[in-house]
Protein backbone atom coordinates (compact mmCIF):
# COMPACT_ATOMS: atom_id res chain seq x y z
CA UNK A 1 0.00 0.00 0.00
CA UNK A 2 1.02 3.60 -0.51
CA UNK A 3 0.50 6.41 2.01
CA UNK A 4 0.99 10.03 1.10
CA UNK A 5 1.26 13.10 3.28
CA UNK A 6 1.71 16.70 2.16
CA UNK A 7 5.15 16.31 0.64
CA UNK A 8 6.19 12.82 1.63
CA UNK A 9 5.17 9.51 0.12
CA UNK A 10 5.92 6.21 1.82
CA UNK A 11 5.60 2.60 0.76
CA UNK A 12 4.80 0.01 3.38
CA UNK A 13 7.22 -2.92 3.30
CA UNK A 14 5.45 -5.67 5.18
CA UNK A 15 3.93 -9.13 4.59
CA UNK A 16 0.67 -7.32 3.76
CA UNK A 17 2.24 -6.06 0.53
CA UNK A 18 3.00 -8.59 -2.16
CA UNK A 19 4.52 -7.89 -5.55
CA UNK A 20 2.15 -10.33 -7.23
CA UNK A 21 -0.81 -8.03 -6.48
CA UNK A 22 -1.72 -6.32 -9.79
CA UNK A 23 -3.39 -3.48 -7.90
CA UNK A 24 -0.08 -2.13 -6.61
CA UNK A 25 1.05 -0.80 -9.97
CA UNK A 26 -1.88 1.53 -10.74
CA UNK A 27 -1.94 2.70 -7.13
CA UNK A 28 1.69 3.74 -7.23
CA UNK A 29 1.36 5.38 -10.65
CA UNK A 30 -1.74 7.29 -9.63
CA UNK A 31 0.05 8.56 -6.56
CA UNK A 32 3.09 9.67 -8.52
CA UNK A 33 0.91 11.66 -10.88
CA UNK A 34 0.19 14.39 -8.35
CA UNK A 35 3.20 14.58 -6.03
CA UNK A 36 5.81 16.08 -8.30
CA UNK A 37 6.45 18.98 -5.97
CA UNK A 38 9.98 20.18 -5.50
CA UNK A 39 11.95 18.35 -2.82
CA UNK A 40 9.39 15.56 -2.36
CA UNK A 41 10.81 12.63 -0.42
CA UNK A 42 9.92 8.94 -0.77
CA UNK A 43 10.35 6.41 1.99
CA UNK A 44 9.73 2.72 2.60
CA UNK A 45 8.21 1.93 5.97
CA UNK A 46 9.39 -1.23 7.69
CA UNK A 47 5.88 -1.65 9.13
CA UNK A 48 2.87 0.54 9.72
CA UNK A 49 2.26 2.05 12.22
CA UNK A 50 4.80 0.47 14.55
CA UNK A 51 7.95 0.99 12.46
CA UNK A 52 9.30 3.99 10.64
CA UNK A 53 11.60 4.09 7.64
CA UNK A 54 14.72 2.11 8.55
CA UNK A 55 17.76 2.28 6.32
CA UNK A 56 18.66 -1.41 6.21
CA UNK A 57 15.07 -2.47 5.52
CA UNK A 58 14.73 0.23 2.88
CA UNK A 59 17.60 -1.05 0.77
CA UNK A 60 16.69 -4.71 1.20
CA UNK A 61 13.04 -4.16 0.24
CA UNK A 62 13.51 -1.50 -2.43
CA UNK A 63 14.28 -3.72 -5.47
CA UNK A 64 11.38 -6.06 -4.78
CA UNK A 65 8.90 -3.24 -4.21
CA UNK A 66 9.88 -1.34 -7.35
CA UNK A 67 12.03 -3.09 -9.94
CA UNK A 68 10.11 -6.36 -9.84
CA UNK A 69 6.93 -4.57 -10.94
CA UNK A 70 8.70 -2.35 -13.49
CA UNK A 71 8.58 0.72 -11.28
CA UNK A 72 12.12 1.79 -12.13
CA UNK A 73 11.32 5.46 -11.69
CA UNK A 74 10.03 4.86 -8.20
CA UNK A 75 13.28 3.09 -7.34
CA UNK A 76 15.06 6.28 -8.39
CA UNK A 77 12.79 8.44 -6.24
CA UNK A 78 13.35 6.39 -3.10
CA UNK A 79 17.06 6.11 -3.79
CA UNK A 80 17.30 9.86 -4.33
CA UNK A 81 16.00 10.45 -0.81
CA UNK A 82 18.16 7.70 0.67
CA UNK A 83 21.31 8.92 -1.09
CA UNK A 84 21.00 12.30 0.59
CA UNK A 85 20.86 10.62 4.00
CA UNK A 86 23.77 8.33 3.15
CA UNK A 87 25.99 11.15 1.99
CA UNK A 88 25.10 13.28 5.00
CA UNK A 89 26.09 10.43 7.29
CA UNK A 90 29.35 9.76 5.45
CA UNK A 91 30.21 13.45 5.59
CA UNK A 92 29.41 13.71 9.29
CA UNK A 93 26.50 16.07 8.75
CA UNK A 94 23.11 16.10 10.49
CA UNK A 95 20.65 13.77 8.77
CA UNK A 96 17.88 15.82 7.15
CA UNK A 97 15.84 12.86 5.88
CA UNK A 98 13.48 10.71 7.93
CA UNK A 99 15.46 7.49 7.53
CA UNK A 100 16.45 5.87 10.79
CA UNK A 101 19.39 3.61 11.71
CA UNK A 102 21.45 5.00 8.83
CA UNK A 103 24.47 4.55 11.11
CA UNK A 104 24.25 0.75 11.05
CA UNK A 105 27.53 -0.49 9.51
CA UNK A 106 25.99 -2.75 6.87
CA UNK A 107 23.62 -0.07 5.54
CA UNK A 108 26.04 1.31 2.90
CA UNK A 109 26.70 -2.25 1.73
CA UNK A 110 23.00 -2.98 1.38
CA UNK A 111 22.67 0.27 -0.59
CA UNK A 112 25.22 -1.05 -3.08
CA UNK A 113 23.39 -4.38 -3.23
CA UNK A 114 20.15 -2.56 -4.07
CA UNK A 115 21.91 -0.61 -6.80
CA UNK A 116 23.29 -3.88 -8.16
CA UNK A 117 19.73 -5.14 -8.58
CA UNK A 118 19.00 -1.95 -10.50
CA UNK A 119 21.89 -2.75 -12.82
CA UNK A 120 20.48 -6.22 -13.45
CA UNK A 121 17.08 -4.84 -14.39
CA UNK A 122 17.98 -1.59 -16.13
CA UNK A 123 21.43 -2.27 -17.54
CA UNK A 124 24.92 -1.79 -16.23
CA UNK A 125 25.65 1.25 -18.39
CA UNK A 126 22.59 3.13 -17.17
CA UNK A 127 23.34 2.14 -13.60
CA UNK A 128 26.94 3.32 -13.85
CA UNK A 129 25.84 6.69 -15.14
CA UNK A 130 23.20 7.19 -12.47
CA UNK A 131 24.69 5.49 -9.40
CA UNK A 132 28.32 4.74 -10.21
CA UNK A 133 29.64 7.73 -8.28
CA UNK A 134 27.65 6.79 -5.18
CA UNK A 135 28.90 3.20 -5.27
CA UNK A 136 32.54 4.26 -5.57
CA UNK A 137 32.17 6.92 -2.89
CA UNK A 138 30.72 4.35 -0.48
CA UNK A 139 33.56 1.93 -1.15
CA UNK A 140 36.16 4.65 -0.63
CA UNK A 141 34.44 5.72 2.58
CA UNK A 142 34.51 2.19 3.97
CA UNK A 143 38.06 1.50 2.85
CA UNK A 144 39.31 4.69 4.51
CA UNK A 145 37.78 3.54 7.83
CA UNK A 146 35.32 6.40 7.68
CA UNK A 147 32.61 4.40 9.40
CA UNK A 148 32.99 4.45 13.20
CA UNK A 149 31.97 0.78 13.53
CA UNK A 150 33.88 -0.70 10.59
CA UNK A 151 37.58 -1.19 10.03
CA UNK A 152 39.21 -2.73 6.97
CA UNK A 153 41.97 -5.08 8.07
CA UNK A 154 45.05 -6.07 6.11
CA UNK A 155 43.41 -9.36 5.15
CA UNK A 156 40.83 -7.43 3.12
CA UNK A 157 37.98 -8.21 5.51
CA UNK A 158 35.79 -5.81 7.43
CA UNK A 159 35.95 -5.94 11.22
CA UNK A 160 32.88 -4.60 13.00
CA UNK A 161 32.78 -3.38 16.59
CA UNK A 162 29.99 -1.52 18.39
CA UNK A 163 30.93 1.72 20.10
CA UNK A 164 28.84 1.38 23.25
CA UNK A 165 27.59 -2.19 23.21
CA UNK A 166 24.68 -1.42 20.91
CA UNK A 167 23.42 -3.81 18.22
CA UNK A 168 25.17 -3.39 14.88
CA UNK A 169 23.47 -6.21 12.96
CA UNK A 170 19.89 -7.24 12.28
CA UNK A 171 20.11 -9.56 15.31
CA UNK A 172 19.14 -6.84 17.76
CA UNK A 173 16.92 -8.59 20.32
CA UNK A 174 17.42 -7.38 23.88
CA UNK A 175 16.62 -9.15 27.16
CA UNK A 176 17.10 -7.53 30.56
CA UNK A 177 18.81 -4.59 28.91
CA UNK A 178 21.43 -6.72 27.17
CA UNK A 179 21.77 -8.02 23.63
CA UNK A 180 20.68 -11.63 23.31
CA UNK A 181 23.25 -12.28 20.57
CA UNK A 182 26.01 -9.65 20.62
CA UNK A 183 27.94 -9.83 17.36
CA UNK A 184 31.30 -8.26 16.61
CA UNK A 185 34.34 -9.13 14.54
CA UNK A 186 34.38 -10.47 10.98
CA UNK A 187 30.61 -10.69 10.63
CA UNK A 188 29.86 -13.08 7.82
CA UNK A 189 27.09 -11.17 6.02
CA UNK A 190 29.03 -7.91 6.24
CA UNK A 191 31.98 -9.45 4.45
CA UNK A 192 29.83 -11.26 1.90
CA UNK A 193 28.26 -7.92 1.05
CA UNK A 194 31.69 -6.25 1.06
CA UNK A 195 33.20 -8.74 -1.38
CA UNK A 196 30.16 -8.45 -3.62
CA UNK A 197 30.28 -4.64 -3.45
CA UNK A 198 33.95 -4.52 -4.42
CA UNK A 199 33.45 -6.62 -7.54
CA UNK A 200 30.25 -4.85 -8.51
CA UNK A 201 31.88 -1.46 -8.07
CA UNK A 202 34.79 -2.59 -10.23
CA UNK A 203 32.39 -3.78 -12.92
CA UNK A 204 30.94 -0.27 -13.25
CA UNK A 205 34.33 1.10 -14.30
CA UNK A 206 36.13 0.72 -17.62
CA UNK A 207 38.89 -1.77 -18.25
CA UNK A 208 42.26 -0.34 -17.29
CA UNK A 209 40.77 2.10 -14.81
CA UNK A 210 43.08 2.34 -11.79
CA UNK A 211 40.21 2.34 -9.29
CA UNK A 212 38.73 -0.75 -10.95
CA UNK A 213 42.03 -2.60 -10.64
CA UNK A 214 42.39 -1.52 -7.02
CA UNK A 215 38.92 -2.76 -6.09
CA UNK A 216 39.61 -6.07 -7.77
CA UNK A 217 42.85 -6.39 -5.81
CA UNK A 218 41.09 -5.71 -2.51
CA UNK A 219 38.45 -8.29 -3.40
CA UNK A 220 41.11 -10.86 -4.27
CA UNK A 221 42.78 -10.24 -0.91
CA UNK A 222 39.49 -10.68 0.93
CA UNK A 223 38.80 -13.91 -0.93
CA UNK A 224 41.99 -15.63 0.24
Language model: regions and residue ranges:
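Acidic, mature catalytic/reactive cores of soluble proteins
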Residues: 1-224
Amino acid sequence: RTWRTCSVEVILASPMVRIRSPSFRPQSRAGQGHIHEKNDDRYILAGYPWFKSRARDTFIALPGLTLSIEEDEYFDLVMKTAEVALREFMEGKPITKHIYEIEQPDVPLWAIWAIQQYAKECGREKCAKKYGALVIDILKYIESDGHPNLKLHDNGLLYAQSSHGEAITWMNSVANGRLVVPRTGYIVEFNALWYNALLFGASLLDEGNAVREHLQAVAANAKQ
